[in-house]
């Protein structure tokens, strides 16, 4: 929420400054092409995320992995992030953001001061989202998602104030995502049951302001919130010592999955646009 308020304040300040110029509405009808560059990061709403287990392989998660004495093998807990340490005391690194850059093209129609349009966008990004479980052996087990790129189809509606156009935007998003698993456990075998690379979808919502510096060229600032629905990534633990925690219920092993299928991203971008 703090991030959204800061972005809204910046966009609002630019809009207010332009409105103060009391310019007449310019002509925004037509096609355009442009580029964007900015920064994206994981929304801080998954702090309670953990890894869940299916010990009897019936497709239902929430089972407790038990040691030979009946104790919870994962009593050490979980952390939101990635670690290379086998114990939780070693700490976890937070989720990582990264630069974003891409291209867009679209078309606007102007009706008085109201401007409505559609656009398509392709953006390269680098945002990572991890969760780690710790067993008492000790060992760490990390499930990670890497967002590599976004395709989006959005509508936008704005109110032209001379050469300045504040607007809201929203639409559909597709994402190129890599999913991976790593562990410090060398006693068992870990197999990816789900595909590691996939396209997933979701939606985007945001706001921005665009200002014409010439009749054809404009610069802009934009905030976007993206929510993606990852339908689950499963890893199976098998092998190891006879009667071990992962094979004591079902000899074929135990499945791992993460509790949160949502991948939520904040993005702040600058845009440069050429209008035909």
Regions found by a protein language model. Give the residues of each.
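Gram-negative outer-membrane beta-barrel domains
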Residues: 2-276
